[in-house]
Design a protein with these regions (language model features):
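C-terminal amphipathic alpha-helical interaction region
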Residues: 99, 459, 474-600
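A short core secondary-structure module
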Residues: 187, 191-245
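A structural-propensity feature for long, helix-poor, extended segments
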Residues: 133, 142-145, 149, 444, ...
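C-terminal helix-coil-helix/basic helical segment that borders enzyme active sites and/or dimer interfaces
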Residues: 359-398, 504-520, 541-558
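A glycine-rich, basic-preceded beta-loop-alpha segment at the flavin cofactor/substrate interface
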Residues: 196-198, 235-251, 256, 266-297, ...
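Internal maturation/activation junctions in enzymes
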Residues: 126-130, 141-183, 193, 369-388, ...
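Alpha-helix capping/hinge segments and adjacent helical runs
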Residues: 2-5, 10, 182, 259, ...
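Amphipathic, small/basic residue-rich leader segments at the start of a protein or domain
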Residues: 1-124, 148, 583-584, 590-600
Length: 600
């Protein structure tokens, strides 16, 4: 039977041959685990995803939430799926045993979550949003806030959201207008409007805890004047019981291109002047707090994009194997049977491109999860700091590269199915529509490119970048031991050398105040940087594949050869194409920057 969510063999390759998941069990936090417990968690995730989430993915899409009597109504299949997720303990997969969690490494929890993201992106979003909100309260909330709001979220009784966007302020959060007035009892009264709030209303939980950005009366201008508040749908009494309905109104639902099973809400806070909120962290420090949740969300968005690309790839692969059509160019006899389309060279090209994109991005997402484990469990402060610097640098890539190129994989999946791919009778068009959100939310490509080039590269004296260059060089040195990888290694080395030169020039210009010209083509820089990182990850996979082939296991030979062919494609087809973008960056080309509004 074909696998539809992800390749279990590829997952095992990543966990146990590339990323050394078993090595994490040597660390104190994960000492109670071993490969058997890891595999058991993955098996449980796969079973729940296949049984509860995948079956209603299409129904979710065809029956988006309805607005009735001030409430959002979902299809009935969503709640049992989410309940199964909660009952299996996945909401707290990475939390400690003492806190009621599985104490899994983030690497393993992300491997588990990947099955749900592939099976049903929309229904999966509800618990995922809750995890992010809970982590925020755990990091910055008071003990009272943790008891009143965090514990019910950990227990799965309360769900959470992230409420940032306003009708006039999307990426530009410094312009938000939601206000918070202090009240005599130490709480605050909020007034404002938020839009595009995923999970902003539903009946999946007893309560919904909104994490809301707002400004205090004395707030300084800009991002330094933003504060963070807990605003529950229902107030919570001191004994933990639910109190009165808070002054939070569901004003309406947005009707989206994809992710139709997730409520996208417009929320009004304080229409009646009595929206109660509680300050989280220090006044005017809300955005720095929220960035923790946003960075977690950005990594989650990247993995979500990967898995939608993965689902489309697997479906189109099965289709190509089963769909007979035409004959090979050298066949001159029309009486011969048609061949499966997978035998045609151009179909192979499209499948190989998908494989290179989704498996390269899958590796990167899991590598980022492994880095997150390193930030908390490596032995020394220095080691943990280095892991954090590298993860911080890579976060824009983890979010944006899969969002762009796994979406392209979805496009190729549609093309492989031809006319069938363009119909709603086949799932690949939904995968594309669902994935089209990922380049937009949690920071657009443009925002990610500015973050990378304008902030992350030079952060801490370029510590993260120096680490990355060193790691790529170490991989290249190991690849030199495999002469068959020379043709794969050399294009990456050439790209890294030129990228370093371009980066130094751009950072020098930025330091000299040439901000507009330096950042004008940041989107091109993001693409090249991302291809460099993915190229590095593919060279790592190629080394492991060579080592696997050397063991002589016949059953694995096709798998490893497929890895090497995908690495060959990416490193010899995709990586060299980046030199065109680098030439534009080197020239500080102002074609786009110099375009005037009235010329359009």
């Amino acid at each position: 039977m074909s696998e539809t969510l992800l390749s279990s063999r590829n997952l095992a390759f990543e966990l146990y041959e590339v990323l050394d998941a078993e090595g994490l069990t040597q660390r104190e936090r994960f000492a109670e685990h071993n490969r058997e417990t890891f595999d058991a968690a993955i098996s449980t995730a796969r079973n729940i995803a296949e049984k509860y989430f995948a079956p209603h993915n299409r129904k979710n899409d065809e029956n988006e939430p309805r607005y009735e009597n001030g409430q959002a109504i979902l299809i009935p299949e969503v709640k049992p799926a989410v309940d199964a997720f909660l009952e299996a303990g996945f909401l707290n997969a990475a939390r400690s045993f003492e806190a009621g969690g599985m104490q899994l490494p983030t690497l393993l929890s992300q491997a588990c979550f990947a099955h749900f993201q592939s099976a049903n992106a929309a229904s999966t979003s509800y618990p995922f949003l809750t995890m992010g909100a809970a982590n925020l309260i755990e990091s910055f909330g008071t003990e009272e806030q943790k008891q009143r709001f965090l514990q019910p979220m950990i227990d799965g009784r309360f769900f959470g959201t992230m409420a940032l966007t306003e009708p006039h302020a999307g990426s530009s959060l410094s312009d938000i207008r939601t206000r918070a007035e202090p009240a005599a009892d130490g709480s605050y009264r909020l007034k404002g409007n938020k839009i595009f709030i995923s999970g902003g209303d539903h009946s999946l939980s007893e309560n919904i805890v909104h994490m809301v950005l707002a400004k205090l009366p004395d707030a300084p201008a800009g991002v330094k004047g933003i504060s963070l508040f807990i605003v529950p749908k229902f107030l919570v009494n001191e004994d933990g019981s639910l109190g009165a309905r808070n002054d939070v109104l569901l004003a309406g639902l947005f009707h989206k291109m994809g992710w139709r099973g997730t409520t996208s809400t417009a929320l009004n806070f304080g229409d009646n002047g009595n929206c109660v909120g509680y300050l989280v962290g220090k006044p005017h420090q809300g955005l720095s707090c929220m960035f923790q949740m946003m960075n977690e969300a950005r990594i989650g968005v990247g993995m979500g994009a990967v898995m939608l690309g993965y689902a489309g790839y697997l479906y189109s692969l099965d289709y190509a194997r089963e769909r007979p059509q035409g004959r090979l160019p050298d066949s001159k006899d029309p009486s011969t049977a048609p061949v499966a389309i997978i035998q045609h060279a151009d179909i192979k090209r499209m499948l190989l491109t998908q494989k290179a994109y989704v498996e390269g991005a899958f590796d990167l997402g899991l590598y980022a999860a492994r880095l997150f484990d390193d930030t908390t469990t490596l032995q020394t402060d220095t080691e943990r700091k280095q892991a954090h610097e590298l993860l911080d640098l890579l976060t824009p890539i983890v979010k944006s590269w899969p969002s762009e190129f796994c979406l392209k994989a979805n496009e190729l999946a549609i093309q492989i199915l031809g006319g069938h791919g363009y119909t709603r009778e086949y799932p690949v068009e939904q995968y594309y529509r669902d994935n089209r959100l990922n380049p937009i939310h949690e920071g657009t490509h443009g925002i990610q490119s500015l973050d990378l080039l304008g902030r992350k590269l030079a952060q801490n004296g370029g510590a993260g970048l120096k680490q990355l260059i060193r790691l790529i060089a170490e991989t290249g040195a190991r690849a030199q031991k495999h002469p068959s990888l020379t043709a794969l290694r050399e294009p990456l080395e050439q790209l890294v050398n030129r990228l370093q030169s371009v980066t130094i020039g751009l950072l020098t210009d930025l330091a000299q105040g040439k901000v507009n010209s330096s950042l004008a083509n940041s989107a091109l820089y993001l693409k090249v940087f991302g291809h460099t990182v993915i190229g590095w990850r593919w060279l790592e996979q190629a080394i492991r594949a060579e080592e696997g082939l050397a063991k002589g296991e016949a059953a694995d030979a096709a798998f490893y050869k497929g890895k090497l062919q995908a690495a060959r494609y990416f490193l010899t087809w995709e990586v060299p194409s980046c030199h065109h973008e680098l030439a534009i960056l080197e020239a500080r080309d102002d074609t786009c920057l110099g375009m005037q509004e009235e010329w359009f």
